[in-house]
Amino acid sequence: MFLNSRDDFKKYLENKKKPLMANYYKMSRIKFDLLVKDEKPVGGKWSFDKDNRKKLPQTVKLPKRPVAFETKHTKVLKKFINITFENHPGNTENFWLPTTHKESTVWLDDFLTEKLNLFGDYEDAVSQRDNILFHSALSPLINSGLITPEKIVDRLKKLRTKVNLNSLEGYIRQVIGWREFMRGIYQNYSIEMEKGNFFNHKRKFKKEWYSGETGIPPLD
């Protein structure tokens, strides 16, 4: 489910005074031969993140989300959840994720052909028109083992000259950079992070944060 092992990350930590996503990502790009030539980044920069902060114009047509079909297993699980967790938040009728490898591959194909080219431009955009926009929504599928990062990386390698560089680099950074790096940080520093208070925050959230009445739409 991950491209690097726990030992790989420990070896990385041995050679660094302080773990930083930027140098970890650079190391991974070279290791997996992604957008590099002679160990230098294609396009002259390791990250095009500054290019990936555009607002989403109303004129941009949003891609449709691929349909995930209900299976005999999801039917049974929905009934179980509705009975066992009837007082919990959420609604099983809104379940929209694929639950098989075949469907997950369809979602990957759809992302690569319909979304990836504009993923970078609108990576940080927020819109009331949709909550996914040009993102892949593959994270839960990767985390549950329905599709592997290896498969995704192999497909991305074939698109080197076919999509916008800022989009391709931006998505590669999510898969081999942030995902792998944060896993390594959690495995090696989780106790310190759990017990620590880096920003020395001492104020408590008001009850509105828990009841969904802050007046801030994304939170409520």
Please describe what each predicted stretch is:
Residues M1-L97:
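Beta-rich, aromatic/charged-enriched effector core domains that present basic-aromatic interfaces
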Residues K54-D220:
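Catalytic cores of enzymes that engage adenine nucleotides and/or redox cofactors via long glycine-rich
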